[in-house]
């Protein structure tokens, strides 16, 4: 429980003008209406032959597709846990090296009477002690509806995010999450309970939060085991991320805020490839069902010699 409490408190500890607090607030802005206590910080194979067939499919649906959303994702997530367990653990980082990660992202933000989807690139460099550095580059905003764009123009075309921003990152508390599936389930369930949205949807978000950063095979396997036990997680099926990489997707629907959260994995390695938030009928923004309000594609992970170096 202490680890997830730390996970929630992480944003408040980040120094600098562009810190993890702001980054996490951006990720969760689409759901802040019902998540007041955590606005700043929150969130495959039915049978083996089915998975093999899915991977071979040439035409993959996008992860934002609505799909049938009827089959349980539990068998597939259990398979992902098995795949993770046999992955070779990465050698520990040594002094003078950093774990580099790059994400292609889009976050919903806005003002009075308008919202914009802001595309950008986030990069991080993580040192052996878990601390690091975050750099963000933001492109021109896009707008979910013409009314949003009109509202933005009427407001004087305010700058949503600066073109570039950066800040320090403290050590991630995810490094200390338990790898025993039962213990991890209890930890995540206790942290998710009573945080505005449904407990099941919040648990799904917390699992995704922990999968975003590189995790040991043991932790990744435990996270998939936990996800397999969350009620209502649906099998989406074959999918492609925004870079065109093929994988398999699962989803959780938060009925309180009418939002669908999709995760897409590489079934060969169990790595998280990307995620996407889409609105459903009855959402608080009154957007058409299927409107994308957030996404992240995990593009690059590598070891580099110093902060600022890119592979």
What are these regions (language model features)?
Residues 1-77:
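N-terminal export/targeting signals for secretion/compartment entry
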Residues 47, 52-311:
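Intrinsically disordered, low-complexity prosegments and terminal tails associated
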């Amino acid at each position: 429980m202490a680890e997830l409490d730390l996970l929630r408190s992480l944003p408040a500890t980040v120094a600098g003008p562009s810190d993890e607090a702001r980054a996490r607030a951006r990720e969760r802005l689409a759901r802040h209406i019902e998540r007041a206590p955590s606005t700043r910080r929150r969130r495959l194979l039915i049978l083996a032959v089915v998975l093999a067939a899915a991977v071979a499919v040439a035409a993959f649906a996008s992860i934002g597709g609505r799909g049938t959303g009827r089959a349980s994702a539990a068998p597939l997530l259990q398979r992902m846990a098995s795949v993770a367990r046999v992955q070779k653990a990465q050698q520990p980082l040594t002094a003078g090296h950093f774990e580099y990660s790059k994400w292609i992202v889009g976050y919903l933000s806005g003002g009075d009477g308008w919202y914009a989807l802001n595309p950008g690139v986030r990069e991080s460099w993580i040192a052996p002690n878990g601390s690091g550095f975050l750099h963000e580059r933001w492109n021109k905003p896009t707008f979910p509806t013409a009314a949003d764009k009109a509202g933005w123009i009427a407001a004087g075309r305010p700058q949503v995010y600066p073109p570039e921003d950066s800040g320090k990152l403290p050590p991630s508390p995810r490094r200390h999450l338990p790898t025993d599936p039962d213990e991890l389930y209890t930890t995540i369930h206790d942290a998710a309970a009573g945080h505005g949205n449904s407990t099941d949807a919040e648990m799904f978000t917390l699992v995704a939060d922990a999968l975003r950063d590189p995790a040991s095979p043991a932790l990744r396997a435990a996270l998939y085991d936990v996800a397999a036990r969350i009620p209502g997680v649906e099998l989406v099926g074959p999918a492609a991320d925004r870079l065109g990489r093929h994988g398999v997707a699962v989803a959780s629907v938060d009925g309180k805020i009418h939002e669908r959260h999709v995760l897409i994995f590489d079934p060969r390695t169990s790595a998280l490839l990307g995620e996407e938030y889409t609105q459903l009928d009855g959402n608080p923004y009154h957007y058409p069902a299927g409107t994308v309000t957030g996404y992240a594609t995990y593009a690059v992970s590598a070891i580099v010699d110093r902060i600022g170096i890119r592979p």
